[in-house]
Amino acid sequence: MTRSVSFPLFLFAVVLSLSSSLLADDPKPIRREVYEGGKIYDISHRYTPEIPAWESSEGLGKTFLRLAASMKNGSFANVSEMKLSVHSGTHVDAPGHFWDNYYDAGFDTDSLDLQVLNGPALLVDVPRDKNITAEVMESLHIQRGVRRVLFRTSNTDKRLMFKKEFDSSFAGFMTDGAKWLVENTDIKLIGLDYLSFAAFEESPATHRVILKGRDIIPVEALKLDGVEVGTYSLHCLPLRLVGAEGAPTRCILIK
């Protein structure tokens, strides 16, 4: 009697074990921006065909990433290839981006200072539907000694980085705002929430102001929704692209 009861229980255990194994062979990836209940925030955007690209109505497009070698086609491994501008998605600018003499001298993303790219950072809210002018910069009351500032603008509210078509009306720094920052603050890293930290209509001039001294690093296209205003530990690690004036970057905030 005991053996007849045990046998069905044994079969049930085997079936349950096999079912668990089958489920384990079909895992689902977990994608998230917030870790440990808000202790870590991933403020980098995902690279997808729909992410906006500079002056493009089609985003990055489906061809920016392709599977060059496929196991389904007989290859021993899956190998992807990527082709895109170094100023796509969340990225940094190096001095050579708008200064040709700096480009020739080798001021590329490999030369950027990791001590600037990593450390305490202040996240501030910019008055909505405004570009960052000298007046706006003064109104933010950023204290001397603050070296890294992330500027959240109406770009985040409008979710511009989630819209495929490039939007030239994005909020950004005007030239006078950039000059005010250089002359009146100790900021060495600026972060913004669209493809350029500089407003579209004054982009070249504003970039030249910020990059002229080779001591301020712009980080662009940050994902700043869902993060409270305040001070964090910022960690940005650009690809070490020798000879490139920009590089895709993974950035996180730690509370």
Swiss-Prot record:
<keyword id="KW-0611">Plant defense</keyword>
<comment type="similarity">
    <text>Belongs to the Cyclase 1 superfamily.</text>
</comment>
<dbReference type="GO" id="GO:0099503">
    <property type="term" value="C:secretory vesicle"/>
</dbReference>
<dbReference type="Pfam" id="PF04199">
    <property type="entry name" value="Cyclase"/>
</dbReference>
<dbReference type="GO" id="GO:0005794">
    <property type="term" value="C:Golgi apparatus"/>
</dbReference>
<keyword id="KW-0732">Signal</keyword>
<comment type="function">
    <text>Acts as a negative regulator of fumonisin B1- and pathogen-induced programmed cell death (PCD), and regulates pathogen-induced symptom development. May function redundantly with CYCLASE2 for normal plant growth, development and viability.</text>
</comment>
<dbReference type="GO" id="GO:0005783">
    <property type="term" value="C:endoplasmic reticulum"/>
</dbReference>
<dbReference type="GO" id="GO:0043069">
    <property type="term" value="P:negative regulation of programmed cell death"/>
</dbReference>
<keyword id="KW-0272">Extracellular matrix</keyword>
<feature type="signal peptide">
    <location>
        <begin position="1"/>
        <end position="24"/>
    </location>
</feature>
<keyword id="KW-0964">Secreted</keyword>
<dbReference type="GO" id="GO:0019441">
    <property type="term" value="P:L-tryptophan catabolic process to kynurenine"/>
</dbReference>
<dbReference type="InterPro" id="IPR037175">
    <property type="entry name" value="KFase_sf"/>
</dbReference>
<dbReference type="GO" id="GO:0005576">
    <property type="term" value="C:extracellular region"/>
</dbReference>
<dbReference type="GO" id="GO:0005886">
    <property type="term" value="C:plasma membrane"/>
</dbReference>
<protein>
    <recommendedName>
        <fullName>Cyclase-like protein 1</fullName>
    </recommendedName>
</protein>
<dbReference type="GO" id="GO:0004061">
    <property type="term" value="F:arylformamidase activity"/>
</dbReference>
<dbReference type="GO" id="GO:0006952">
    <property type="term" value="P:defense response"/>
</dbReference>
<dbReference type="InterPro" id="IPR007325">
    <property type="entry name" value="KFase/CYL"/>
</dbReference>
